[in-house]
Regions:
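Non-globular, low-confidence helical/coil segments that flank catalytic cores
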Residues: 2-269
Length: 269
């Protein structure tokens, strides 16, 4: 019987939402849980009333269910400590979770023990978008681990890669690293899109616009085609530059100045 019960539990745990990812609940919800639990125990011992038992049980289930809902009143940005590397997570008040890069060359298993642990701490069971600037280890090796950790309690929606022209490759290593990344994503069944300058996504007040690379950009290294994203949320803006180098920065400045000129603005960078 115990063996059958174990196998049944193991089987059911693979279904989506079979496991509730609560994250770390706030003090008020922890207090509410214990308050209901104590009232239930006291009512059961003193009153021995089945109706009160039933009411307390329903309240306890409601409290436990509510533990998994973390409401953000504003956008939250977390710059994770990954050592020599980069990993930034954004949570919007609409409930979108976005990751910009995730890797390190100074910390081992940064995906499992830093990024994934942080997401579980926040009660996040899915990343809507993962923006990868370029496939260098200090920006992507943690994402490989996140892909391996995908299960019924965690999933990755869409991965955004820089839209580079393969025919323009000068450094073979840069091309090989990108091909490896694409193959891993394809085998994992994760949706992949490519962003060129001007492409954007928007959700409520939150938007991400690709500033680089331009379509057909001739790159010389992985850093050279590093995607640059402009994140905007209301009056707040943040430029995610990855490892963009001087050539890429010059290209972005020229594009911005050209657009400003077309719009009749006198501002120059």
């Amino acid at each position: 019987i115990l063996d059958f019960y174990y196998k049944l539990c193991s089987l059911s745990s693979h279904f989506k939402y079979a496991v509730i990812v609560t994250g770390i609940p706030d003090t008020a919800r922890v207090f509410l849980y214990y308050a209901v639990l104590i009232i239930w125990i006291c009512a059961h011992i003193i009153l021995i009333n089945k109706k009160i038992d039933a009411v307390c049980f329903v309240l306890l289930v409601c409290v436990l269910t509510g533990l998994r809902y973390n409401i953000n009143s504003d956008m939250k940005i977390a710059m994770l400590d990954v050592g020599q590397g980069d990993s930034i997570v954004m949570h919007t008040k609409e409930g979108m979770n976005v990751l910009f890069d995730g890797g390190s060359t100074s910390k081992k298993n940064v995906g499992r023990y830093t990024i994934y642990t942080y997401l579980k701490y926040c009660g996040v069971r899915s990343l809507d978008y993962v923006f990868i600037s370029h496939p260098d280890k200090d920006h992507v090796n943690g994402i490989y681990e996140l892909i391996e950790l995908c299960d019924n309690t965690f999933e990755i929606g869409t991965v955004v890669l820089p839209g580079i022209s393969r025919a323009a490759a000068v450094k073979k290593q840069a091309d090989d690293d990108m091909s490896k990344l694409e193959m891993i994503l394809k085998n994992a069944g994760i949706n992949v899109v490519y962003a060129d300058a001007g492409d954007s996504i928007k959700s409520g007040e939150f938007s991400v616009e690709c500033m680089h690379p331009c379509k057909g950009y001739n790159y010389e290294s992985a850093n050279d085609y590093s995607a640059v994203y402009l994140v905007e949320y209301g009056d707040f803006s943040m430029l995610m530059t990855g490892d963009a180098e001087k050539k890429a920065e010059k290209c972005i400045v020229e594009d911005v100045n050209r657009i400003a000129g077309d719009a009749g603005e006198s501002v120059r960078f």
